[in-house]
Regions:
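Generic detector of well-ordered alpha-helical segments enriched in charged/polar residues
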Residues: 5, 69, 139-143
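Conserved catalytic-core segment of NTP-binding enzymes
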Residues: 15, 20-119
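NTP-binding/hydrolysis catalytic cores, primarily Walker-type P-loop NTPases
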Residues: 125-161
Length: 161
């Protein structure tokens, strides 16, 4: 928290982007992703104004995204603004055999296809950041939400819009 505050005071940036490495939760009892400890620690120090959660490619049930959002709300203290579906797919068979994480990489068009087919009308949007249209949509969402914060802050301090 002090580190981010120091950057904020020293550089006065318009935006601070914090990427959290590693997994947010275990895959299973063997492949633990360090239990999402790094994500938990960072979430206790810094509350995001906008959050993008990346998920691995899979044919995920729509309800799963809502469950993830609830999990983040209670575990990390913030809600998910949008999901990014990565072009990376978890290779469970090889990972279990080798007791280490293995992934397969896909063409981003395959990810676009599943997003368009299953997730295009969800309350919490699902994007593929490698798709230029999706990238523009994410940027628009960020600007919209952060602009609303700026307006509220001006009203709170008695400033004009």
């Amino acid at each position: 928290n002090r580190y981010v505050r120091k950057i904020e005071k020293r550089e006065n940036p318009d935006l601070i982007i914090i990427g959290i490495p590693g997994g947010l939760m275990p895959f299973n009892k063997t492949l633990t992703n360090n239990f999402g400890i790094i994500a938990f620690l960072i979430s206790q120090a810094v509350t995001p104004d906008f959050s993008i959660v990346s998920v691995l490619y899979d044919d995920i049930d729509v309800k799963y995204f809502n469950m993830l959002n609830n999990s983040f709300r209670y575990k990390y203290g913030f809600e998910v603004d949008c999901f990014n579906m990565a072009v990376t797919m978890f290779d469970a068979v090889t990972s279990i055999e080798t007791q280490s994480l293995h992934f397969n990489f896909l063409d981003h068009a395959a990810v676009d296809d599943i997003i368009n087919a299953k997730y295009s009308k969800e309350d919490i949007p699902v994007f593929n950041i490698l798709n230029p249209e999706h990238k523009s949509a994410i940027i628009a969402l960020i600007i919209e939400k952060l602009s609303a914060y700026a307006v509220r802050e001006q009203l709170k301090t008695g400033g004009r819009i």
